[in-house]
């Protein structure tokens, strides 16, 4: 075997394996299995994602949106499985950045990390932009552009303060938010089922799932592809818990398990919720004309108060997602700076007394606030987020597949069966998504992607060690020291 092929993630303790991969432990390893699960599930935020983007599928093909969700969501799950194996083989902070760097070279790895970092930041910004009108609507308040930007910036600041204080605070907040969301959403789902089965409201039959209810004129192929973007918006951010690998106990096993469980759980729960929403829905045109389609559907079924409760849970879930995305984005920057591959690397790689890369956290906040200036192009911001994620993970999947064929990938504690078929399938799917996203809006999304690529080239060109290998010296931190269970 060549490269890292002789390494075995199953046989070595966390910190010892990290040193075999070329890094000294620097972060505090406190996170357990549930925290790793909560980070991944919190990133996906299936309820928040569905509530705020349900119209994406509905406007494309009407009730038939259920089938693109099932099929495209299943393909997203295959990507999740493959990324889980990659993070099991390489349980290193930085996720895709480090994995692609080792398998595809320093330049490609850095660019992949850059794209995913931008996706995390854009998603943080778009989540906060989406939350503001809903929260203010509860109090009968509406804002103009600059008011919206200011309110979104305030939410980003709250997320930043949670993240910069300590890993313990951020993970406890995420854990609590995930538990509350899971319990309450399960109860609401039971309520919807009971209302549909025993209430007086009419229930659509299964044949309704095979109609477009007047939303499609002509060929259905492109509308189905556009509807398939909904699960790609909701079910994404696959390596987020992998970014916290150096802060997770038994990371080679805990992280992939958390990733798989969170993604499969989100997919399953999302499928049930979307099915119930479609069956409970009235006229598609009325639903699309409403301010909040999901609340509009649920209000006559559950009553106004329970429908608003569901909306509140979606808000909680989406804010939890924002907190986790900022946490993950800061770890990508920290990992690149540890390798001395960012301008001001010493600042980005510095850790505060709680072993948090605080400068990186504040920079993600600053860029996210700047992104909110694009709030009038909210849909474009979401599309840019997804296309950057898809591009980054597509590169990760390709390098991982080639590495496995060459025998240069460490033996992972979690492995995908049938990988010779599954990996190429996910690569083709990722390429298809890129084409659909750019074709749908070539001027803004295509140009935005080009700008992101060029900006990455510029930043990489001025990085102090763009041609160097990995930096294995100790941390540049406020309080240097090896990883430990400091609970």
Residue spans for each PLM region:
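C-terminal membrane-solvent junction of multi-pass transporters and transport-like membrane proteins
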Residues: 173-176, 346-358, 393-442, 470-473
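TM-loop-TM module centered on a large, flexible mid-protein loop between adjacent transmembrane helices
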Residues: 98-99, 105, 137-141, 210-215, ...
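A generic transmembrane alpha-helix motif of multi-pass inner-membrane proteins
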Residues: 383-389, 418-487
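Extracellular loop-to-transmembrane helix junctions
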Residues: 49-145, 151, 262-272, 445-455
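Membrane-interface loop-to-helix entry segments
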Residues: 147-204, 259-263, 382-395, 421-425, ...
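Helix-loop-helix junctions that connect adjacent transmembrane segments
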Residues: 26, 66, 142-147, 176-311
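Membrane-interface "cap" regions at the ends of multi-pass membrane proteins
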Residues: 1-54, 59-64, 77, 81, ...
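Helix-loop-helix connectors at the membrane interface of multi-pass transporters/channels
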Residues: 101, 107, 128-150, 184, ...
